[in-house]
């Protein structure tokens, strides 16, 4: 089961990256990790740096993917983002936290993607 979930996560992150690029974003970092946590995608669009959490599922039977981004997860993303901002001296930008949901199709390589801009604030 773990391998299947990893495959869904990898596929979802790639789909999210393609979507963001097509929407005019520049990808600054994927899977940024530090001692505070991880951010799936860090992207730039105009004067915004966005910290994107990607949630992928094989179905929405047990709830929407974004429902897995609980307060604790949001706090980890926020702290990791603060570290990234400080380490890169990105003081002249606005910042935003987005979520991308990806529901994968078992039968083929298709998927449904939902971009939730400004999904949360802390």
From Swiss-Prot:
Q: Name one GO molecular function term.
A: nucleic acid binding
* SUPFAM superfamilies in the cross-refs: Restriction endonuclease-like
InterPro entries for this protein: Restrct_endonuc-II-like (IPR011335), tRNA_endonuc-like_dom_sf (IPR011856), UPF0102_YraN-like (IPR003509)
The highest taxon in the source lineage is Bacteria
Gene3D superfamilies to which the protein is assigned, alphabetical: 3.40.1350.10
**Database matches in Pfam families:** UPF0102
Question: Family per UniProt?
Answer: Belongs to the UPF0102 family.
Q: What is this protein called?
A: UPF0102 protein CA_C1763
């Amino acid at each position: 089961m773990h391998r299947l979930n990893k495959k869904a996560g990898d596929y979802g992150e790639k789909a999210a990256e393609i979507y963001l690029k097509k929407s005019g974003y520049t990808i600054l970092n994927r899977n940024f990790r530090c001692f505070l946590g991880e951010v799936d995608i860090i992207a730039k669009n105009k004067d915004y740096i966005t910290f994107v959490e990607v949630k992928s599922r094989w179905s929405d039977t047990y709830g929407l993917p974004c429902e897995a981004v609980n307060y604790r997860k949001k706090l980890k993303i926020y702290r990791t983002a603060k570290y990234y901002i400080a380490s890169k001296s990105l003081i002249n930008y606005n910042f935003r936290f987005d979520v991308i949901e990806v529901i994968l199709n078992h039968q083929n390589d298709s998927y449904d993607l939902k971009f939730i801009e400004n999904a949360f604030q802390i």
